[in-house]
Amino acid sequence: MKPLHLKLNNFGPFLKEEIDFSKIDNNELFLISGKTGSGKTMIFDAMTYALFGKASTEQREENDLRSHFADGKQPMSVTFEFQLNHRIYKVHRQGPYIKEGNTTKTNAKFDVFEMVDGKYEIRESKVISGTQFIIELLGVNADQFRQLFILPQGEFKRFLISNSREKQGILRTLFDSEKFEAIREILKEEVKKEKAQIENRYQQIDLLWQEIESFDDDKIKGLLEVATQQIDKVIENIPLLQVRSKEILAFVNESKETAIKEYEIIEKKTLENNILKDNINQLNKNKIDFVQLKEQQPEIEEIEAKLKLLQDITNLLNYIENREKIETKIANCKKDISKTNNKILNLECDKRTIDKEKKMLEENGDLIESKISFIDKTRVLFNDINKYQQSYLNIERLRTEGEQLGDELNNLIKGLEKVEDSIGNNESDYEKIIELNNAITNINNEINVIKENEKAKAELDKLLGSKQELENQINEEKTILKNLEIKLDRYDKSKLDLNDKESFISEIKSAVKIGDQCPICGNEIQDLGHHIDFDSIAKRQNEIKEIEANIHTMKSNIAVHNFEIKFVNEKISNINIKTQSDLSLEVLNKRLLENENALNNQRDLNKFIEQMKEEKDNLTLQIHNKQLRLNKNESELKICRDLITEFETLSKYNNITNFEVDYKKYVQDVNQHQEHSKEIEDKLIQLSQRKLIEQNNLNHYENQLETYNNDLELNEQSIEMEMSRLNLTDDNDINEIIAWRGEQEELEQKRDTYKKRYHEFEMEIARLESLTKDKELLDSDKLIDEYELKKGKMNTLIDEYSAVHYQCQNNIKKTQSIVSHINYLNQELKDQQEIFQLAEIVSGKNNKNLTLENFVLIYYLDQIIAQANLRLATMSDNRYQLIRREAVSHGLSGLEIDVFDLHSNKSRHISSLSGGETFQSSLALALGLSEIVQQQSGGISLESIFIDEGFGTLDQETLETALDTLLNLKSTGRMVGIISHVSELKNRIPLVLEVKSDQYQSSTRFKRN
C-alpha cells in the first residue's frame, strides 16, 4: 500500500488540511518534523482511522481524535487515497458526533471507492461491511497494520521487550495462529466426546448383559455373574450361555410336542362323533322333505305337455313374424322408388338450365380468343414493362447527355493540343542535375578542407605554445627542486632523533638523583641539568619538514606538467593537415554559386516539364474517360430506341400506361370467361354423376322389390304347411297357444327346479346313508370335557415354549449386540488412541512442553529474528545478535528475546541494552517482522512504512547506520517516512514534511533542504 493523498477535517489539530504524498519522488525517504504537540503522530492516526476506524496507538480512543476547536455543526472526517497492486482506492470516513443543538449522536459514515477509467466508482457504503472490505483488500487488520505499515510512538519497542504472553497476542494477530488453538480445542472436545461415547458403550454392554434371561437356571446365573468390564470373560461366556439356552428350549419343546399329539387325538375323536350326529339328523330330515316333493309330480307332468306344444309351434310363429317384416320392407322399397324418380326429374331440369348458360357463354368465344391471342403475344412486354417504361423515360436524358459529352470531349482535345504545344521538344535532364550536384559537393569538400586546415594550423600553434610554456615551468621547478635537495642535505638528521626521546629522558630524570648509577651507561650521575637543546632540535625538525613538503610539492608539480606535456603531444599527433586545392577560397565560392544557380534553373525547368507531362497525362485520361462515357451513352441510347421499337411493333401501342390498362383488362376478362366455363363444366359433370347415382339407386330398389315379393310368396307357403302339421285350422288356435308364451319361462323354471331338487335328495340321502352305516354314536358331554382338558394343557405348554423361544432369540440378539459393542469398543479404543495422543501433544503434554500454537509462533519468531539479525549486525557493527530464550515451561513460553553480545560471547537480558542499542534492536526486529509477515501473508503489498520513535537516543555513527538501513528500504521500492526531533536528520534527509502549529490548529507543507 502506498499513500497518495490525505485530507483531514476537524481531525486532531488539523481543521482543514491536505497532504499530497505524490510529491514524494521515487519512494524518497522523508522526515516529518515539527514541535512537540504539533500533530505529527496525528498524520499516522488519520491514515489508520481512515482505513480501520482506529488510531495508530491503542491508547487513543475515537472520541479523542476530534479537534477541540472544531465547529460544533461540522463532522470529523478523513479522506485517504492510496495505491495498492497498481490500483487506486479512496476511502472517506466520518466519525460519529453530537451535532450542536441536537441530543442524539449522528452516526458514522464510511465509503470505499475504486478508480476505474479515470473515475471513482463506489465499492462499499456501510461502516461494518466497508471496514471488512478494507481488511480483505489489504490483507491485514488494524493491529497488523500498526506492526507492518506504521510503527507508532510508544509501541515501537513493545514487541522487543514483551514477554511470551504479550508476544503471543501480537504474533497470534499477525499470523492468524488462533486456528491452531482452535484445533487444540476441537481435539479436546473430540477426546471428551470419544471418552463419553466409550463410557456410554460400556453402559450399553452392562445394560444388555443384565437384561439376558437366566430362565431361573443356576448354570446360566453363574455365567451372568461375570462383570461387564471383563469384556474378554464376557466374550468367553457367551457361547456357553447360548448352549445352555438351547438345552432348556429343547426340553420345553419336547413337552409341548407330547401335549399337541394328545390334543390332536381327542380333537379328532370329538370331531368324528359330532359329524356322525349331524349326518344322522340330516338323513332323517331329507327323507321327510323327499316324500313331500314327490307329491308335486302330476302338476309337473301337465307343465311338460304345455312346454312341448310351445316348442312345436315355434317354427310357425317365426314364419308369421317373418311375413310382417317382409311386408314392411316392400312398403319402404316402394317409397324409395318414388323418391328416386322425383330426384331424377329434378336433375334433368337443372341440366337444361345449365345448358342454356353454356350456349350463351360459347357465343362470346371469338372475342375471348382474340384477347387471349393479344395476351400471349404481349406477355413478354408486360412482364418487362419497367424496362420499356424506363426506355421512354431515359431516351431524352441520354440524348442531352450525349450532346454534352461530345462538347466536353472536344474541349479536352483542344486543351491537350495546347499542352503538347507548350512541351514542344523540351525534355527533363536529370543527368545534368546529378553532374551539378557532384560538382557542388566537390567544391564544398575543397572549401571544407581549406577551412579545417586553417583551424588545425591555429590549434597546432596554440598547442606548441602551451608545450613551450610547460617545458619552461618544468625547467624552473627542477631548478627549485635541486636547490631544496641541496639545502636538505646540509642538515644532520642523526641529532634530530633525540627529540623523539624527550619524554623518555624526562621519565629517567624523574626516577634518579645525583650520585645514582645511570641505568643507560652505568656511570655515576653528576648533574641532572639540560645537556640537549630540545627547542632548537624541534625548530630544525620543522624546517626539514617544510623543505620535504616543498620537495614533495615540486615533484608533484613536475609530474603533473609532464603528464600535461604528454597530453599536448597526443593532441599534436592527432592534428592532420590535409592536401588542399591550389585555387583560392574566393574562386571556389564563386564557382559554387554559379553551379548552384545552374542547378536551380535546371530543377525549375524539369519541374515545369514534369507538370506539363502530368497535365497531359491527366487530360489524356479525361479524354479516355469521356470517350468511354460517350460510347456508353450511345450504347444505352441505342438500347432504349430498340426497346421502344420492339414495344410499339408488338403491342401496336405508343403509350405504356394505355397498354398496361388494356392488358390487365383483357387478362381479367379471359380469366373470368375461363372460370365461368370451368364452373359450368363442373356443374354438368356433377349433375351427370348425380343422375347416374340416382338411376343406379332406382334399379337397386326395383330389384329389391322383386326379391321381397318372391320371399313373401315362399313364406306364405311355409305357414300353410306348419298349420296343417299342427292341426290348426285358423288364427284363433294359434293365438291361444301364443298366449302361453308369456308363462313359458316361469313354467320351465318350475319344471327344472323340481327335477333338480328331486335329484339332489336322491344323491344326499344315498351319501348320508353311506356315512352313518355301521357307526355308533358316543356320549358328547364326556368327549367335550376330555377335549377341553387336553386343549388347556397344550396351550399352556405352547405359551411356555413361545416365551422360552422368544427369550432365547432375544438372548441371542443381545449377546450379538454385546459382541458387536465389544468389537466396536476395541476398534474405537485402537482408532482413538492416536487422537488421544495427538490431543495431549497439541495441548503441551510433550517433551518440549509447548502447545501447537506456541510451537508455530516460535517458528515464526525464529524467522523474524533471523531476518532482523541481518540488519542488526550492520547497525551494531557485528556486535549484537537477537536470540530466542530457549527455556520453556508448559504452554505460554519460549517467546522471550535476549541479546547475544559477540564481544563477551554471552547472552544477556534485553533490558541491559542502552537506549540507542534498544532502538537499533527494535528497528531491526520491526523491519524483520514486517518482511516475514509479508512473505507469509502473500497478498499483503508493503510499499510504505512510517516510523515514529527513537532517533534521539542514537549517536552520530549509529544514526548514520540506521538511516542507511532505512535508505536500503527505499531501494526496495518502499516509501519510508520518519518522525524525529533530531536536527541532524533535517540536514541528512533532503525532503521534510513540516508540521506547524499556531496554538489552536496545525498545517503542513513539503520542503527540500
Swiss-Prot record:
It holds the Pfam family AAA_23. Residues 176-208, 264-364, 392-501, 535-776 form a coiled coil. InterPro entries: P-loop_NTPase (IPR027417), Rad50/SbcC_AAA (IPR038729), SbcCD_Nuclease_C (IPR053380). Keywords: ATP-binding, Coiled coil, DNA recombination, DNA replication, Endonuclease, Exonuclease, Hydrolase, Nuclease, Nucleotide-binding. One of its GO terms (biological process) is DNA replication. Disulfide bonds: none annotated. ATP binds at residues 34-41. Gene3D superfamilies: P-loop containing nucleotide triphosphate hydrolases (3.40.50.300). GO terms for molecular function: ATP binding; ATP hydrolysis activity; endonuclease activity; exonuclease activity. It comes from the Bacteria. Belongs to the SMC family. SbcC subfamily. PANTHER family: ABC TRANSPORTER ABCH.3. SbcCD cleaves DNA hairpin structures. These structures can inhibit DNA replication and are intermediates in certain DNA recombination reactions. The complex acts as a 3'->5' double strand exonuclease that can open hairpins. It also has a 5' single-strand endonuclease activity. Heterodimer of SbcC and SbcD. This is Nuclease SbcCD subunit C. The lineage of its organism: Bacteria, Bacillati, Bacillota, Bacilli, Bacillales.
